[in-house]
Amino acid sequence: MTDTLKLGVPKGSLQNATIELFKRSGWKINVHSRNYFPDINDAEINCAICRAQEMSIYVENGTLDAGLTGKDWIAENQSDVHVVTDLVYSKVSSRPARWVLAVAGDSPVKTLEDLQGAKIATEMVGFTKRYFAERGIDVEVEFSWGATEAKVVSGLADAIVEVTETESTIRAHGLRIIKELMQTNTQLIANKKAWEDPFKQKKINQLAMMLKSALVAETLVGLKMNVPEEKADDVIAILPSLNAPTVSHLYKSTWLSVEIVVDVSVVRDLIPQLLEKGAEGIVEYSLNKVMF
């Protein structure tokens, strides 16, 4: 009987981004409607769709061997799991999200202490209660099923603790952020007993390596160019390569072929500079995976 890894894939806002990341990493996950057990092109993995809020619970109790969920929900559930690696991606960006404390724009509240005796709405009830209790501030924390920002506007709460990536929804409701309570990102986690199993640990490490390499590749591009030999030093001097560039002679020519990997953010400024220094035939190409 073939060993298999029981892997949890987050349902909801992270689902599409996670499936796309797996695709770029070499695994194709096919989700069927009204079916929580998608197919995957790997006989050694069995997938299950699970809410990110509950993922760490199922990983901790062994229902799943491993899964992807937010650092925030691991903290909320106080789950005792092995964190394999951080994977910084989300539904809209490649930056960590933030859980923030916010109040109405015209609220007199300026500090945490000003919320003594206040009512706070949030989906992260356990974390929020512990956060204020640790600071000796007595507050009433209520669970919010959604549209949390509207609770302050409608007077149902004095403040909210809500996750944000861009702050656009918070600003749209006229709210003001008092304090950032935590940063969060996706993490690959494993059941501690499963992590001790050689097959499962090897498979989980394979997942971690390939998923991280695909995320790294998102931020980088490759550049290839031809450079006259006499101008090579000038061109190479301005290259912000991860490592030394690859340089080779063109066949029966005094020209060189130069190839580098650079951060995508520098390309728009770098290419004009390369042309000025004498490079020609510059080609930019995307990368699927980058491993260090």
UniProtKB/Swiss-Prot annotation:
Keyword Transferase attributed: yes
Gene3D superfamilies attached to this UniProt entry: 3.30.70.120, Periplasmic binding protein-like II
Catalysed transformations (reactions): 1-(5-phospho-beta-D-ribosyl)-ATP + diphosphate = 5-phospho-alpha-D-ribose 1-diphosphate + ATP
Cofactors, names only: Mg(2+)
CDD domains: PBP2_HisGL3 (cd13593)
GO biological process, one term: L-histidine biosynthetic process
Metabolic or biological pathway: Amino-acid biosynthesis; L-histidine biosynthesis; L-histidine from 5-phospho-alpha-D-ribose 1-diphosphate: step 1/9
EC number: 2.4.2.17
GO CC entries: cytoplasm
Role description: Catalyzes the condensation of ATP and 5-phosphoribose 1-diphosphate to form N'-(5'-phosphoribosyl)-ATP (PR-ATP). Has a crucial role in the pathway because the rate of histidine biosynthesis seems to be controlled primarily by regulation of HisG enzymatic activity.
HAMAP family, per database record: HisG_Long
Protein name (database record): ATP phosphoribosyltransferase
Organism the protein comes from: Desulfatibacillum aliphaticivorans
